[in-house]
Amino acid sequence: MPGIAVAQQKSLKDQIIGSWTLVQAVDTQADGTKTNPWGANPKGAYMFSPDGRFAQMLFHTDLPKIDNRMGGTPDQNKAIAQGVVAMYGSYTVDEANKTINVKFEGSSFAKFAGTEGKRVITSINDNEFQSTNPATSTGTKADSVWRRVK
């Protein structure tokens, strides 16, 4: 019909580009048990650039506050090592399967470097997306909610 404009839907890649902050993270074990691996109020950032680069950081709610990052007790250092994950690399988007495929170039968890991962986008709009990591390094399925930084 003349005079009727049809809005084109954005691609998943166009929707995901930008900076996001972590709202919720829940891991599900094989037996169905759910845990909050990053605490009750997790902190984190996820950034996707238009040229296919990403960076992600996850922080536990209750990290020890130490005066010198080169110091700390063994227990404090262990809590920090277990309570922080940062990674970066490149990504591609599989529009048909609604997945983000990541190639880790570096990570605070050194085992990730040189590996690949998949994040299934289960829901997305202009302000929020939900994703699932079907196979974490701890053997769980991780579901997370991210809100766009304005």
Feature-to-residue mapping (PLM):
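Lipid interaction determinants
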Residues: 3-150
